[in-house]
A protein has these predicted regions:
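Rossmann-like dinucleotide-binding domain that binds NAD(P)(H)
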Residues: 215-302, 312-314, 318, 394, ...
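A contiguous active-site-proximal alpha/beta segment in oxidoreductase catalytic domains
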Residues: 135-137, 142-216
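N-terminal glycine-/serine-/threonine-rich beta1-alpha1-beta2 phosphate-ribose binding loop
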Residues: 1-135, 147-162, 452
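NAD(P)-dinucleotide binding in Rossmann-like oxidoreductases
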Residues: 284-372, 421
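C-terminal helix-rich "cap/oligomerization" subdomain common to oxidoreductases
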Residues: 10-36, 158, 284-287, 381-452
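Active-site-adjacent bridging/hinge elements
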Residues: 225-234, 370-380
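Core domains of carbohydrate- and sulfate-ester-processing enzymes
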Residues: 190-230, 234, 435-441, 447-448
Length: 452
């Protein structure tokens, strides 16, 4: 928590000139605390993919937390009917619909917004929402670049709103077990993303579907003709809109690895390399790597390693893990993939784990599931206690930045990069610094503001 406070102060004072003192964590610093008896009206922005989970989560707590999904917003109107039907069936209420998020922000009846848009819309949408006084839940990765994450933090501070991020929360009991010395001094954490990623083909450019407001969908990205293979979901695999699997699945495991190492800071050394293997470029136009290894070192020498392997590969660990984490300590190691188990030294059988009495999770511990983050978000809107957010935007920035820093090294041929985390600049490397933001700039009017 101390490092989080320090980062917020530095980010605000260093780049925005906002004198916040310790107010960022005081309930009295938030002017828009929502009373216990007042219904909280939510707009879910982006309902074609991950947004469906947001609809379900808020519907499940509609009575216990007095929440209503008052609006659904998506630039593709083809998703509206199913989203409205879901809300009707799960909550008994019919939400309004909108394709332009700016109109949602102008609606004074909306208290908070929940973003499940593509990555490249997260920062600008969040900043606009903050400027309108809306609290924000934003999916992982919180940003498309390192600079965007910093601007989001500054906006939350300036407009005194809460921002929760949607990286999978690391299981509280596993993290506490390691923090309390369960496997000794942890010196390395690994993250695994071993998802099969086959060719998705090539199609010629075409007119966008009549249901899609394409200019708004493209937003801050450079203008390009509509192409089905660069649209819904496949935007992940093109640099102007996505961050590859290192920035797609990666933030979940990077987040868990960082938390397990006890790091609320940036690494000081980065190198990442890989490529597109096993796919004929004549049959698939993918730009981001399907195979990538990213290495990070922190100031105290602790290491983080992240592997993306989208072609034929083995699973790892005793659980045959394909999506998860491995932690290595001076007295043993721990496997984490939903559940977890710890091994002493060279022993073959675990001595602690998620289903063992040695480490049972407190049922009140909200860190153990993604769904709990939605309820926690609403709780904080009522209490005003920013420090109670289990997935605070600052942590989301550290986790997302790992993916961004890795991709910067990848773009530069995998070369070693030295990073000054306090300044969020590379050391004597203007070529790398240029990649901390959009290399192509921001397309008007969807421009990231210099001052939020």
């Amino acid at each position: 928590m101390t490092k989080r406070r320090e980062f917020i102060k530095k980010s605000a004072l260093g780049t925005a000139g906002i004198a916040i003192g310790g107010a960022g964590f005081s309930s009295r610093s938030y002017e828009s605390i929502i009373g216990a008896n007042e219904r909280i009206n939510i707009s879910v922005i982006g309902v074609g993919g991950r947004g469906s989970a947001h609809l379900s989560a808020y519907s499940q707590i509609k009575d216990s937390h007095n929440v209503r999904i008052a609006n659904i917003c998506d630039v593709d109107e083809k998703f509206w009917a199913e989203a409205v039907k879901t809300v009707q069936e799960k909550s008994g209420f019919t939400p309004t619909t909108e394709w332009d998020m700016r109109k949602v922000f102008a609606n004074k009846d909306i208290h908070a917004v929940s973003f499940a848009t593509p990555n490249f819309w997260h920062a600008l949408g969040t900043i606009w929402a903050c400027q309108a006084g809306k609290h924000v839940y934003v999916e992982k990765p919180i940003s498309h670049t390192v600079l965007e994450g910093r601007k989001m933090i500054e906006a939350g501070i300036k407009y005194k709103v809460h921002i929760q991020h949607g990286s999978a929360v690391a299981a509280g009991d596993a993290m506490d077990f390691m923090k309390n010395g369960g496997i000794g001094d942890i010196y390395m954490a690994r993250g695994l993303c071993l998802k099969p990623r086959d060719s998705f083909g090539i199609t010629p450019d075409s007119n966008p579907p009549v249901t899609l407001h394409y200019d708004m969908w493209l937003g801050p990205a450079p203008w390009r003709p509509y192409n089905e293979k660069k649209g819904h979901y496949n935007w992940h695999w093109f640099w102007e809109t996505g961050n590859g699997d290192t920035g797609n699945q990666g933030p979940h495991q990077l987040h868990a690895a960082r938390v397990g190492l006890g790091k609320e800071e940036h690494p000081v050394w980065i190198s990442s390399f890989g490529g597109v293997y096993g796919i004929d470029p004549k049959e698939c136009a993918q730009e981001t790597p399907n195979t990538q290894t990213s290495l990070f070192k922190y100031a105290d020498g602790k290491m983080l390693v992240f592997d993306t392997r989208g072609r034929y590969t083995n699973a790892e660990g005793s659980n045959n893990t394909t999506i998860g984490n491995l932690f290595y300590g001076s007295e043993g190691y721990l496997e984490y993939s939903g559940g977890w188990k710890a091994f002493r030294k060279w022993e073959k059988e675990p001595f602690a784990g998620a289903k063992m009495k040695a480490a049972q999770q407190d049922p009140k511990d909200l860190r153990g599931s993604v769904g709990s983050a939605f309820a926690n978000f609403i709780d904080v809107l009522r209490s005003g206690r920013d420090q109670d957010l289990i997935n605070h935007i600052v942590g989301g920035h550290y986790s997302a930045s790992l993916a961004h820093l890795a991709n910067i090294s990848y773009h530069l041929g995998g070369r070693e990069l030295h990073f000054d985390g306090a300044k969020e600049r590379f050391i004597n490397d203007p070529e790398a610094d240029a990649l901390l933001t959009r290399k192509s700039g921001y397309r008007k009017p969807y421009v990231l503001p210099d001052k939020v």
